A protein has these predicted regions:
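N-terminal basic, amphipathic alpha-helical segments
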Residues: 1-67, 272, 276-283, 294, ...
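Conserved core segment of the aminotransferase class I/II
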Residues: 239-308
Length: 408
């Protein structure tokens, strides 16, 4: 059942998801925490990591700028970190959007402790405990964590592996029951990797506007595109403040500093107040270090380097999975980001495969983490951000062999 020698084995593409549209409580945090702890071990090959490999990040420059800022005693208080955030960083964030074709009012930007806080604050601003939130299927578990944390329910919406959330299905769900908000990742969605076409983005924003349905847009991977043009955002098509856009530098510059932001549209006042009540302030030193880097160094040059690396590594990993995984395996075709979503034959249980791989010193992301239901039990997510090496290659081949052993 294992492909070994055919380097031209055909790649089978994923099929659209078909979740059962039932509103359910969310309880995924324990499984995700357990999985992430195993990923954090130093001797494991991190194919299951949700984080980008840090080897391509400019840590020396960032730390030098942070050290220089730390010598300024005027920054030792918290006032510079109070909402909405440090003005220098806010100016650079607004400038970056403008460079990518979207005009942003700097006064709308609220700096947060990573995109996770931005998502949590935006969700809290538009919904209350017990409300139902529409999500993609599969969906990034950080979205599910936010819903779980606030005692809300989630309903999964059918999602196409190339085009994104099924807008007609979302409209039908919103018509049939109260939906407080919709959480989506239109660019390089984790785990599917798709880039939603512009016409579908317009259609989704039009639906949200008509239905008065707030959309929380997770844009953390927007800078990691493989094509020639920076992708548009849902926010760029929003004329009524219905889109709450969240992003961060964690996936493109450094995860260690935990700096994100929100563009909350008409909900800005609520989000700023919640930010103040939640964490009071965002630390000033990492804000200033990143602002200094954006002002002085080649951020775009840095991004071109990691985009090129990720695109090459995505092709290598897709080829290896196609060659060494069991017959019938289906693989995503990411347009950006750094993860592959893989559908294995139905006989393969992802949690069993996860345990077998862990015994071999390899981590993978089991599909259970990306759904509120018992879905994607034969799916896994693999991270291709680490520079390609014999160790990575052996790990991918080993996971393929272990998957084949689960067919017996």
């Amino acid at each position: 059942n294992l492909r070994r020698d055919d380097s031209h084995a055909p790649v089978r593409e994923l099929r659209p998801s078909k979740p059962i549209a039932i509103s359910s409580s969310v309880d995924v945090s324990r499984l995700v925490l357990s999985t992430l702890r195993s990923i954090g071990t130093d001797d494991a090959v991190p194919l299951g990591s949700p984080y980008p490999d840090p080897s391509l990040f400019p840590f020396e420059k960032l730390n030098r700028y942070a050290y220089a800022a730390g010598r300024d005693k005027s920054l030792w208080g918290v006032t510079d970190g109070l909402p909405p955030g440090h003005p220098r960083l806010i100016r650079q964030i607004a400038r970056r959007y403008l460079e990518n074709g979207m005009s942003v009012d700097p006064n709308e930007i609220i700096v947060t402790v990573g995109a996770t806080e931005a998502i949590n604050l935006c969700l809290q601003a538009v919904a209350k405990p017990g409300d139902t939130i529409a999500v993609e299927s599969p969906t990034f578990y950080a979205m599910l964590h936010a819903i779980e944390r606030m005692g809300m329910k989630a309903i999964e919406v059918a999602t196409h592996p190339e085009y994104g959330i099924d807008i007609a299905a979302l409209a039908a769900i919103a018509k049939s029951q109260p939906i407080a908000a919709c959480m989506v990742m239109p660019n390089f969605q984790n785990p599917l990797g798709f880039q939603m076409p512009d016409e579908r983005k317009r259609e989704l924003v039009a639906l949200a506007t008509k239905a008065d349905l707030p959309i929380i847009e997770n844009g953390v991977y927007n800078e990691l595109y493989f094509g020639n043009m920076h992708p548009s955002t849902l926010k760029s098509f929003d004329r009524h403040g219905i889109v709450l856009h969240c992003a961060s530098f964690s996936k493109s510059l450094t995860a260690a500093y935990r700096i994100g932001w929100a563009l909350p549209g008409r909900y800005r006042e609520q989000v700023e107040k919640l930010k103040f009540l939640n964490t009071l302030a965002t630390p000033s030193l990492p804000q200033l270090a990143i602002a200094e880097f954006l002002e002085r160094d080649g951020y775009e040059h840095h991004l071109r380097r990691i985009r090129k690396a990720y695109a090459q590594q995505a092709n290598l990993m897709r080829a290896m999975v196609s060659r060494f995984f069991p017959e019938g395996t289906r693989i995503s075709s990411p347009a950006g980001g750094y993860v592959l979503w893989i559908e294995l034959p139905v006989q393969v249980d992802a949690m069993r495969l996860y345990q077998l791989a862990l015994e071999q010193g390899i981590t993978i992301g089991p599909g259970y983490m990306f759904s509120i239901a018992d879905s994607y039990r034969n799916f896994i997510r693999l991270n291709y951000s680490s520079p390609w090496s014999p160790e990575i290659e052996r790990a991918v081949v080993t996971v393929g062999k272990l998957a084949a052993s689960c067919l017996d």
